């Protein structure tokens, strides 16, 4: 899956987030997960965790 910096993604667990750093292209990323209100959580994910790239 082609994922670029600042792409919006939907994870397989249905959480939405934005790619904020590409750790290893096509393998691992840091994303900011949207939380209720103005909060977010930054997590590391693998390419296999992504369900869909929204761009």
What residues fall within each predicted segment?
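Basic/aromatic-rich interaction segments and small domains that mediate binding to polyanionic partners
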Residues: 2-55
């Amino acid at each position: 899956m082609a994922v670029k910096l600042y792409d919006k993604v939907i994870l397989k667990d249905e959480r939405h987030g934005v790619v904020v750093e590409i750790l290893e292209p096509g393998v691992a990323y840091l994303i900011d997960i949207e939380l209720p209100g103005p909060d977010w959580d930054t997590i590391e994910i693998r390419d296999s965790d992504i369900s869909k790239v929204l761009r």
